[in-house]
From Swiss-Prot:
<keyword id="KW-0677">Repeat</keyword>
<dbReference type="GO" id="GO:0003677">
    <property type="term" value="F:DNA binding"/>
</dbReference>
<dbReference type="GO" id="GO:0005634">
    <property type="term" value="C:nucleus"/>
</dbReference>
<feature type="region of interest" description="Disordered">
    <location>
        <begin position="709"/>
        <end position="787"/>
    </location>
</feature>
<feature type="compositionally biased region" description="Polar residues">
    <location>
        <begin position="126"/>
        <end position="141"/>
    </location>
</feature>
<feature type="compositionally biased region" description="Basic and acidic residues">
    <location>
        <begin position="356"/>
        <end position="365"/>
    </location>
</feature>
<feature type="region of interest" description="Disordered">
    <location>
        <begin position="1236"/>
        <end position="1265"/>
    </location>
</feature>
<feature type="compositionally biased region" description="Basic and acidic residues">
    <location>
        <begin position="450"/>
        <end position="465"/>
    </location>
</feature>
<feature type="region of interest" description="Disordered">
    <location>
        <begin position="278"/>
        <end position="416"/>
    </location>
</feature>
<feature type="region of interest" description="Disordered">
    <location>
        <begin position="1128"/>
        <end position="1155"/>
    </location>
</feature>
<feature type="compositionally biased region" description="Basic and acidic residues">
    <location>
        <begin position="57"/>
        <end position="74"/>
    </location>
</feature>
<feature type="DNA-binding region" description="A.T hook 3">
    <location>
        <begin position="1440"/>
        <end position="1452"/>
    </location>
</feature>
<feature type="compositionally biased region" description="Low complexity">
    <location>
        <begin position="278"/>
        <end position="298"/>
    </location>
</feature>
<feature type="compositionally biased region" description="Pro residues">
    <location>
        <begin position="1509"/>
        <end position="1533"/>
    </location>
</feature>
<keyword id="KW-0539">Nucleus</keyword>
<protein>
    <recommendedName>
        <fullName>SET-binding protein</fullName>
    </recommendedName>
</protein>
<feature type="region of interest" description="Disordered">
    <location>
        <begin position="845"/>
        <end position="880"/>
    </location>
</feature>
Length: 1582
């Protein structure tokens, strides 16, 4: 499909016929299977016939494009853009008859036509090959020519795409009908394909069999098709015969598929084509919107220039695209050649009816195509070919068969078609008027001419042309038009995209056909109506949406049509009949009936869509059944939703649609912009720009266009605005209420109709949006964001308060088929024609809408924007708009299907629930923002679109679901780590508190402006836990995306630990009870404090270890027996305290500032690096006030570590550094030295802290080492548990007693440091230096460990980000220390180390702060940068919040960062750390008296860090040496802590299970679990 699309793009660009191939190729490329049929269909419904395929395969696909293109581009003969001047415009019974005389100008259509029919907007440029006129005469030669051309192109297609032919055959089968709609609309060959295959059922069958068959027998059937083109009857016989044989087998399948492809396919193709077109060429879609039709009319007229050449007789389908114009001429000629078309049609009807009564419709299409292929077929190709693009099915079926046999039906259809044509003409005028005006005019003119020439053909042709060309045009044509003429045709790929949708829709049409197989005429009405209705409803909806915004333009064309009856004779009374009576009664009734929406559904929506809906419902139901999972994302989704209540899709689509409604209400521009951004339609962006302008025009421009452009009824602006808007509001309420009520029905309608509605609501500007949205929305069909885009488009129209519309939406599963757009327009009258013809009636509709809250009152000025679609919708029914907005808002978070239902139930809540903060906020404030709506529209454009897009992206990624908090109660901490672990956290973190998320969203909206942000910082700090835990998500739900990452926990999981999510998570999981339990404890508190924004007292409570423990439930000391919870709780509590302290730190910022380490850790790990200077964490660690909880925890950790570290100084150093240092020793040491610091053990602890810090610094390279250690850690989880458990247990045990044991700890620290330094300075020749280094290393690592301990609990994920360096340092340091400690402890005597330690402690006390600050500051800097990035991404939500309060500390943080950055560099640049650290160590240690010693320590740490990278794995090897040194005091603590090294003192080096022996088992368990947890934390962090 891509190749074909590219091929078609190439061909289309290469030549006009390639553009037609764009249509054909576009159809084929979009869906893989249907793409080819579409291609074949695009090439020609009959192009699928090998002949046609040959000439149209190359011709129809290429000839249609190639002929059109080669005729237009390649063949200069038919390359002229035919200008059609509208001689006559008759609106009879809602049917628009345009007599367009084709001036065979190579350039543009007459400016009169432009001005009259499409003022500037509708530029009908029918680029027909000279052959278009000649097509009748030179049809055979042209057919041959184009056959050759097509053949060559088809060879190109077939040769370049041998599979393309097969795929084309196949895709033609799948998309042939869609392409029949798409290409057949503009392809006589296509039409012939229609004729032979009825392009919908038959051609799809043919597509399957005949496509392959025809592709196989390109020359064979191609000649037949050529003959069809040349001799419509003969070729049609061949084509039909080919189709009959080939299609008969595939008849059922092709019928089903063809119905999908043709009815649903027409829709799907249109939608999909539009989508593909918009997606592929959504930007060109507006101009290309006519292009599918316009490739029929413009591309086909341009491309139809070959079609014009093919115009004669059946004019080979490919030449028929020129015949489109030519057929518009040929439509006149069709009157002349009607014998041929009639005979052809009759033959085709006979053959096709024989082929398939059900197919008969498709055959009608085929017959239409055949007729079009023949002069009548040219006429139909004029009509049908113009609409071949999108609406060929409708046009051809009703026109063709109705033309021949069901003239009555055709007339009915023609009324419908005329209504549609009127709609579509305006739509075309609008869609084309923007970008496809000439093509629209061409198509309209072609349709009109074709209609006039071939009354039956024009009727259905017009209807279909209006429908499909409008859709196809708007979809394809818009895309194509948006794409340059060539690009337009090239943009027929939207037909490809449309093909899936069209296939989907075609099944509806086919189902209609199947439903009415015997009634070929009726089926044509049925099919034409259900497919046409689908197309009309959807396409008309799209067209209406496109046309209705253009409605001003169409009205303006209507003004020319109306005003300049000389040029256009527009009979508006019929329109009025159609639109007003039906619309008003339905409006009033439906408004009342619709429930939420007051706006009545368009009467046509009711009646037409009702009739068609029934058929289409079945079709849709069948379609949903037939095409439930196809790539008809939007159309089919919506069809599915309509049909099958595809829960997710339905809700999603409904959400999307509803959201889009709100967007459209709020901002059509936003809708368009959001569409493109949401849909990620890069191609759509250009049309978006024009659609954006169009959207603005749509808002202002419906009235402005009405008043300005719509010189027609300038005075009627109000009436017109409401009427123009009224249909969109009608659709909008339909969509809106459809969304709430018939979710299943809604998606079908929203998919196409809503999108169409959206453009309709959009206004002329919305014309582009429609085509853009048609393409884009349909393009959105597959992506959720596309869906959202589509629904945004839909919601845009839904913005208009037509609440009654939802009834329509409910009415039919084919709500998409409602004649929603047609009904909208038809509701006014023949809907669009009614609007064009009866702008006065439009006033009435607004009155009805006014009844719907939408209102004439909101007219507030004739030209005022108040009645603009968005304004009117916004103004009209705030409640309804709210509903729509609610629906809308949940549209974006498509992942929140329940939200949609909830939102439907709880509008405000769900508004909040809207991930879209702006949307939710706006939703809440919509009543307030009535006056602000204009600004809000802009706001929506910028902020909302950005937020919406981001949110859509996020929610596409994140599935927001409501989960029980208890799910995370078990393992809240791991839940934290699960923040972005795929299974656990992403769901909890977003899903967790949708209500709170919504509330948070609204609160953030309101409170973000207040002082809330700072609290959010705190919350953010805690949110990770909260999010990770059961409760966090309420505060985290909103912050989860922002807050959690800010906390750096999610970031860590996502970024740093995305690589190692399992280790962190696993380590916690392995220490599952403890990590899970421990998080459970802090999270509630964190959650309460953060979520509740606990005041300082609560923070202090949480801060205090006891309080934290008590509050946490399994606090540090409380759960001491279970060391895992305590350890995890300890770490978590540290961070919890840090979080509280962070807040407290904000109060005590200066105090903490002095001791940057604590704050750094707090800030870093609180995820508020900005808020916390590195020293703050250090101070918090050492800060007495903050030390209470932290020191208590740290005391436990320190005590453990001191016991472990002191008792097993060497061993513990090894253990801590090797494994436990990553988690336990680093944490324990950090806590240890912090406690020592806090308790006056500062001299010993600072040394260790410095040593640790620098070991941590040097450990950056050990990050990998830490990872190794981490890997090691998981394997030796027992060892880690023992080590960590003992150390942490001791720390926890010492939580309250540590200060008592402070001296003990200090002594043990000294011993530990002695052994640690000895092990730490393996490469340091000077014991003193080594001791200093070790002390500094210990201190730095202790600080880091403390930071990690706090930071980890605070935000393990947060730690993961900042700690990645720090913990890596710790890991490296720990591993280095462990490894080095094992060997160095032997080497260096404890006394030397102790002597050095004493010295280093003095220096390190200050150095500790500096180094901690530096490390933390650097981490904070990193976090700050990440936070800023995240904030930037999140719209500075947290930038404001975080920056708000932390700004006090940023300078300090910066200072710390300056200091820390070098340290971090040291840490990171392990190889260069040795050189850096000494130089950096002065930076860190310059203030310290023992600067040299610190430098030496740093150097030793660096040296060890260098050694460390190998050491993390080596730590176990060093284990043997360490055992002898550790025994002095450490044995027990060491065993407790490092009880897993070879010796209990050095168990860390050992597997980690020996610890139990030396350590009390409880301590060992503690050591085990905490160590594992911490090791896990530390390791995960690295």
């Amino acid at each position: 499909m891509e190749p074909r699309e590219m091929l078609s793009s190439c061909r289309q660009r290469g030549s006009e016929s390639e553009f037609l191939q764009g249509s054909s190729s576009r159809s084929p490329p979009a869906p893989g299977c249907s793409g080819e049929p579409l291609k074949g269909i695009s090439v020609g419904g009959e192009r699928m016939e090998p002949e046609e395929e040959d000439e149209l395969g190359s011709g129809r696909d290429v000839d249609c494009n190639s002929n059109a293109d080669s005729e237009k581009w390649v063949a200069g003969d038919g390359l002229e853009e035919q200008e059609f001047s509208i001689k006559e415009a008759n609106f009879t019974e809602g049917s628009l008859k345009l007599k367009i005389q084709t001036t065979k100008r190579a350039k543009k259509p007459p400016k009169n036509l432009e001005n009259y029919i499409c003022p500037p907007e509708i530029k009908i440029t029918i680029k027909q090959s000279g052959d278009q006129k000649v097509s009748r005469t030179g049809k055979n030669s042209k057919a041959t020519k184009e056959d050759e051309r097509n053949h060559s192109k088809k060879k190109l297609l077939t040769a370049g795409d041998p599979t393309a032919s097969d795929l084309k055959a196949f895709q033609t089968q799948a998309y042939e009908r869609p392409q029949k709609h798409s290409t057949l609309q503009y392809d006589p060959g296509h039409s012939q394909g229609f004729t032979s295959d009825t392009l919908k059922p038959k051609h799809q069958q043919k597509s399957s069999s005949q496509s392959h068959m025809e592709w196989s027998s390109n020359s064979d059937s191609g000649p037949a098709t050529q003959n069809c083109f040349i001799s419509p009857e003969a070729g049609r016989d061949t084509a039909s015969t080919s189709k009959v044989p080939a299609l008969e087998p595939v008849a059922s399948f092709a019928k089903a598929q063809s119905k999908k492809g043709s009815t649903g396919g027409a829709w799907s193709q249109l939608s999909s084509s539009s989508k593909d077109l918009l997606l592929g060429s959504v930007v060109p879609s507006p101009s290309s919107h006519n292009s599918p039709a316009t490739p029929s009319s413009s591309a086909e007229c341009n491309g139809l220039q070959p079609l014009g050449d093919q115009d004669g007789g059946s004019t080979k389908d490919l030449p028929e695209p020129p015949t489109l114009s030519s057929k518009k001429k040929s439509s006149k000629k069709d009157m002349i050649s009607q014998t041929l078309p009639n005979s052809d049609l009759d033959w085709v009807k006979s053959a096709q009816k024989a082929f398939e009564t059900t197919e008969g419709k498709r055959e009608a299409y085929s017959a239409d195509s055949a007729q079009e292929a023949s002069p009548a077929r040219q006429s139909i190709s004029s009509v049908s070919n113009p609409e071949n693009d999108s609406s060929h099915v409708r046009i051809t079926i009703p026109i063709k068969t109705p033309s021949l046999d069901p003239s009555n039906h055709k007339r009915k259809k023609r009324q419908s078609i005329k209504a549609v044509v009127e709609k579509i003409v305006p739509e075309k005028a609008l869609a084309s008027g923007i970008s496809m005006s000439s093509e629209v005019v061409n198509r309209i003119l072609s349709n009109s001419e074709g209609s006039k020439k071939d009354p039956r053909v024009p009727k259905l042709g017009k209807m279909i042309e209006n429908e499909t060309p409008s859709v196809g045009l708007e979809t394809g044509g818009n895309a194509e038009k948006i794409v340059p003429g060539g690009a337009s045709k090239q943009r027929k790929p939207p037909m490809v995209m449309t093909s899936p949708t069209r296939t989907e829709h075609a099944p509806s049409g086919k189902l209609s056909e199947i439903q009415h197989p015997k009634f070929a005429a009726k089926r044509r009405c049925s099919k034409a109506k259900p497919p046409a209705m689908l197309r009309e409803a959807v396409l008309a909806t799209a067209e209406k949406l496109m046309v209705e915004p253009p409605s001003a333009y169409p009205i303006t064309p209507s003004s020319p049509l109306y005003t300049n009856t000389d040029s256009l004779t527009v009979i508006t009374p019929v329109k009025k009949k159609r639109g007003r009576p039906k619309k008003q009664p339905l409006l009033t009734v439906e408004t009342i009936h619709e429930g939420t929406s007051t706006s009545p559904v368009s009467p046509i929506s009711r009646e037409f869509p009702g009739t068609k809906k029934r058929k289409r419902r079945r079709n849709l139901a069948k379609l949903a059944q037939l095409v439930p999972g196809e790539d008809k994302p939007m159309s089919e989704m919506k069809f599915h939703k309509k049909v099958g209540k595809l829960g997710v899709l339905d809700k999603k689509t409904i959400k999307t649609i509803n959201k889009m409604k709100t967007l459209k209400r709020k901002n059509i521009l936003n809708q368009i912009l959001s569409c493109s951004s949401s849909v990620a339609l890069k191609a759509k962006a250009p049309p978006e720009t024009s659609p954006g302008a169009a959207s603005i025009e749509s808002k202002l421009g419906k009235q402005i266009n009405v008043s300005k452009r719509g010189t027609i009824y300038i005075g009627k602006k109000r009436g017109r605005k409401p009427r123009t808007e009224l249909p969109p509001p009608s659709e909008e309420p339909k969509t809106a209420i459809k969304h709430p009520r018939p979710v299943s029905s809604q998606p079908d309608v929203p998919a196409v109709p809503s999108s169409f509605q959206s453009p309709v609501a959009s206004s002329p500007a919305a014309m582009h949006p429609l085509s853009t949205q048609l393409g884009g929305s349909n393009g959105n069909l597959s992506p959720a964001s596309t869906e959202t885009n589509f629904s945004e488009l839909k919601t845009m129209p839904n913005l208009q308060p037509i609440s009654a519309l939802p009834t329509k939406t409910q009415k039919g599963i084919h709500g998409g088929t409602w004649k929603l757009s047609p009904p909208r327009l038809m509701a006014n009258s023949p809907s669009h024609l009614c609007e064009i013809g009866s702008l006065k009636e439009i006033t009435l509709s607004p009155v009805s809408e006014s009844h719907s809250e939408e209102t004439i009152p909101s007219d507030s000025g004739i030209g005022t924007d108040n009645n603009s679609t968005s304004d009117q919708a916004e103004k009209s029914s705030e409640s309804r708009r709210r509903y729509s907005f609610d629906f809308c808002s949940l549209d974006n978070p498509e992942a929140i299907p329940s939200d949609t239902s909830t939102k439907n139930r709880h509008g405000h809540r769900q508004k909040h629930l809207i991930v879209d903060t702006f949307l939710a906020h706006e939703s809440l404030k919509k009543p307030k923002h009535k006056r602000k709506r204009k600004s809000l529209q802009n706001r929506d454009d910028l902020q909302f679109l950005a937020e919406l897009e981001e949110l859509i992206t996020k929610f596409q990624v994140f599935r927001i679901s409501h989960r029980g908090y208890t799910f995370y109660h078990e393992n809240p901490y791991p839940s934290i780590f699960r923040i972005n672990f795929d299974q656990y956290y992403p769901v909890p973190y977003i899903q967790y508190d949708p209500l709170l998320y919504l509330r948070r969203t609204s609160d953030l909206k309101s409170k973000k402006k207040r002082g809330r942000p700072a609290k959010t910082n705190d919350t953010m700090t805690k949110v990770p836990f909260l999010q990770g835990f059961s409760y966090p998500i309420p505060s985290g739900s909103y912050y989860a995306p922002y807050g959690m990452p800010y906390t750096s926990m999610p970031m860590m999981n996502l970024g740093y630990y995305g690589q190692y999510p399992a280790p962190l998570y696993l380590s916690h999981t392995l220490g599952a009870a403890s990590p899970f339990m421990r998080p459970t404890v802090p999270p509630p508190q964190f959650h309460a404090s953060s979520h509740v924004k606990i005041s300082g007292a609560t923070k202090h409570k949480a801060k205090h270890g006891v309080h934290l423990q008590g509050t946490v439930g399994m606090g540090l000391g409380d759960i001491q027996p279970s060391l895992n919870p305590p350890k995890v709780g300890g770490a978590t509590l540290s961070s919890s305290r840090l979080h509280k302290r962070k807040h407290k730190h904000k109060r005590k910022h200066k105090e903490d500032r002095i001791l940057g380490t604590h704050d750094n850790l707090s800030g870093l790990f609180a995820g508020k690096a900005t808020g916390f200077s590195s020293h703050l964490l250090s101070e918090r660690l050492s800060g007495s006030d903050k030390e209470l909880p932290l020191v208590s925890e740290k005391s436990k950790h320190k005590e453990r570590q001191k016991h472990q570290h002191g008792e097993a100084s060497h061993k513990v150093s090894k253990n801590n550094f090797e494994v436990d240092t990553l988690s336990t020793l680093s944490l324990s040491d950090a806590q240890h030295w912090t406690q020592a610091k806090d308790k006056g053990d500062l001299s010993s602890e600072p040394v260790e802290s410095c040593a640790k810090r620098y070991s941590g610094s040097g450990g950056d390279s050990t990050r990998s080492e830490g990872l190794d250690v981490f890997s090691e850690m998981n394997p030796s989880s027992d060892k880690w548990d023992s080590d960590m458990g003992g150390s942490k247990r001791r720390s926890f045990e010492g939580f309250g007693t540590y200060r008592e044991k402070d001296i003990q700890a200090f002594k043990m620290n000294r011993k530990e440091r002695g052994s640690y330094e000895s092990s730490m300075s393996p490469g340091m020749p000077s014991p003193h230096l080594k001791v200093d280094q070790t002390a500094a290393h210990s201190k730095s690592e202790g600080s880091i460990s403390a930071m990690m301990a706090r930071k980890k609990p605070t935000a393990v994920d947060s730690v993961a980000i900042p700690s990645a360096p720090v913990l890596s340092l710790l890991a490296a340091s720990a591993a280095t220390s462990d490894a080095a400690s094992s060997s160095l402890k032997k080497r260096f005597k404890r006394r030397e180390i102790e002597a050095i330690q004493c010295e280093v402690r003095k220096m390190c006390h200050y150095t500790k702060l500096l180094s901690t600050k530096k490390n933390l500051d650097h981490v904070n800097k990193i976090l700050k940068a990440k936070r800023l990035q995240r904030q930037s991404k999140t719209g500075n939500n947290f930038v404001k919040k975080r920056r708000g309060r932390p700004r006090k500390q940023p300078s300090q943080f910066d200072e710390d960062s300056r200091d820390q950055m070098p340290v971090l560099e040291k840490c990171i640049d392990l190889p260069s750390k040795r050189g850096q650290k000494p130089s950096l160590s002065p930076l860190a240690l310059e203030p310290a008296s023992g600067q040299d010693a610190v430098m030496a320590t740093i150097e030793a740490v660096i040296h060890m860090a260098r050694e460390a990278p190998p050491l993390p794995p080596p730590p176990p090897p060093p284990l043997p040496p360490p055992p002898p040194p550790p025994p002095p005091p450490p044995p027990l603590p060491k065993t407790a802590r490092g009880g897993k090294r070879k010796h209990r003192p050095q168990p860390p080096a050992q597997p980690a299970q020996p610890t139990p022996q030396p350590l009390p088992q409880e301590e060992e368990v503690k050591a085990k679990r905490p160590r594992k947890s911490r090791a896990s934390e530390s390791d995960v962090l690295p």
